[in-house]
Amino acid sequence: MLDDLLHVANAIWVGAGTPVAERCIALAKAGEWEQLARLRVVPGDYKLWHDYKVDAQCVDLLRKCEDLPTGIDLEGVAKTAFLQSESLCCHTNAYFSRFINMGPFGPGDARRLEFISKVREEVQRIVGLPPKRLDFRLGKGGTLSDPGMNSTVPHKFCSEPTITPSALHVLPQWAQTAWARNLEPDVLIQLIDYDRWDSVAKDALKNRGISIQPSINIAAQLAVGKFLRRRLKAQGIDLDTRQEMHRFLARIASVDGSLATVDLSNASDTVAKRVVQILFSLEWFQLLNSLRVPTTKFDKKKETGRLYLEKFSGMGNGYTFELETIIFLAISRAVCGLEDVSVYGDDIIVPTEHVGSVLLALRFFGFSPSPAKTFVDGNFRESCGGDYFSGHAVRSHYQENDCTSPQDWISMANGLRRVWLVDGTDMLDSVVTKAWHLCLEKIPVEIRACRGPEILGDIVIHDAPWNWLSRRKDSIRYFRAWLPYTFEVVEWARFPAGAVLAAALYGVSSNQDNSFRLFGIRTSEGRPSKA
């Protein structure tokens, strides 16, 4: 396990030839995987961008590899972080209760109330009035009604819907949807008062906690999230394009230092109930609160062990991302004014001159800025997956899994090339040249011939144009590609007629053989397409 991947990793470490790289080699040789995953470099310790990029790649390469045998209970770490966030939210709720109940007050509370009022006014300016009608939407993931593979649109349209008692007021609107109208007569709505906690892979040291919601709740939450997204766009914050803008701003700030990039630890899990209550109008709070789920359950096999939540919402709730964006935007604007503030989730960019006050304000509302991912001075900035040192992109390639198939090796080779191309050329940096060729050596010769541009993704090996294998016909260029996926299809006949009609009205496309594509499965029987 991992032998071939470690062979490639070792080539990168040897190619780097720095003390940090030597430390990585020593830890890997000793099997100290947890120490290897915890190894970090600090941008402030470097004067030259390339020196930092080399060492960062050395320590980052396997940091997110879920197959790294660290021996850590990844789900246990995620659960501990969840409970710690709940404890923090409990303290935040207790602190803000006196502002909601209007006393008892202490010294300095008049100024705090004034600032809370300023943030609240900014929130109200952003969100306006609540929507009168909800445009129910389905998410891509599972719900309490639709676990695992049974989470496609038609599956959701014929399962037993679930809803919390507090959300029953949306049923008259939901009843007008094709989903509700076409349910089978014997399908009943199930009342439920909890969500289910689960975790998904994040890196080699921990998982990320998520919550699985009741099906009608999540559909209504997504409707509210869509409405809030439109309100943010009206304020100049287009969440559909904001990541690219943040990366641009981070690059500029790494050169002139005019902006600071702020990142929060466990942001969505630390939005406390009382913070939302005090910052949003009564009408908005009642709507948001009615659609959230008040308790969570850790063990899906047991009815006991539920936890009454101190946080307002977390990952899995359909409006959490928009909600936290609005809160952080309002706090930042209350400090800095309307200009030069940009927020995308918990990625915050503010003028450097105001960042100290913004950090104090965030802490006041119970949030925890991450010291390791907040950059105020120096030549480094990070935001929305973009790392920049003096204007140069220095983001590492993260190998998230072991390489066990040609597709894995193509993906790793492409990842290294994407990060390590010398600016303005088709040449690889010498640090990873050997590692890139080792990746290609792991790929069968017939598949190795599939070369093409980056825009095609990992169905080709990204390479210089003169190495592409392609042909032109009728002004269309065809590339030889590796297609290792087959797509399982499901016959529409498996579903009740009402669910099929509702899915068609929702926009699910159908194949010519009266089936629809379910999901892709990587197979070892894939073969290169003809150019």
Name every feature range the model reports, one short phrase each.
Residues 1-7, 178-345, 349-531:
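Core nucleotidyl-transferase/polymerase catalytic module
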